């Protein structure tokens, strides 16, 4: 469907399927992705990994991840989320200043169609990162300062604070 002529936006995308028994796991699943993305400047790709590329690999060009799998472990969930958070930049973009760096991916996104699961994972992970913190809200606040949570509410996109995350998650 993505390649259909009438689908003006998506028709230029290449879908890479890194799934199934023959795909490998981690670095072994990466070559078809790298081949499709190339440098990342003139390609449009969607990678379907089904858990094959969630730990141990980094694809700097990835700008978002769509979570569909019901991961129980916050560590596994965030390993997948952090794959997309890796920086993508080039040093000395104009060839005249070796100290200059151009950021090519200033933001990234994690989309999850199970918001309660996502917020539960976020709260458990935040609390786990700060075992000495007596107030769970403070622990989660620290995490969301690096990983803000946005929610679509009708026609508006709003940021959810640590208290809101805990209210929904618990």
Question: Whereabouts are the PLM-identified features?
Answer:
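Conserved strand-helix element at the start of the C-terminal RecA-like helicase core
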Residues: 1
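Conserved RecA-like P-loop NTPase helicase motor core
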Residues: 8, 13-133
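Long, largely alpha-helical accessory region at the distal end of helicase-like NTP-driven motors
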Residues: 114-170
């Amino acid at each position: 469907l993505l390649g259909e002529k009438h689908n003006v936006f998506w028709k230029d995308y290449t879908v890479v399927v890194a799934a199934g028994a023959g795909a490998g796991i981690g670095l072994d699943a990466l070559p078809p992705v790298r081949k499709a993305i190339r440098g990342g400047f003139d390609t449009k790709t969607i990678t379907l990994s089904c858990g094959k590329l969630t730990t141990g690999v980094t694809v700097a060009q990835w700008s978002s991840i769509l979570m569909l799998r019901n991961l129980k472990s916050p560590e596994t969930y965030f390993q997948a989320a952090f794959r997309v958070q890796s920086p993508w930049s080039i040093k000395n973009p104009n060839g005249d200043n070796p100290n200059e760096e151009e950021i090519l991916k200033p933001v990234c996104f994690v989309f999850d169609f199970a918001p309660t699961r996502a917020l539960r994972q976020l709260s458990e992970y935040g609390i786990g990162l700060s075992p000495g913190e007596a107030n769970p809200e403070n622990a989660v606040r620290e995490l969301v300062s690096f990983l803000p949570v946005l929610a679509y509410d009708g026609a508006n996109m709003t940021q959810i604070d640590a208290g809101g995350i805990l209210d929904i998650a618990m």
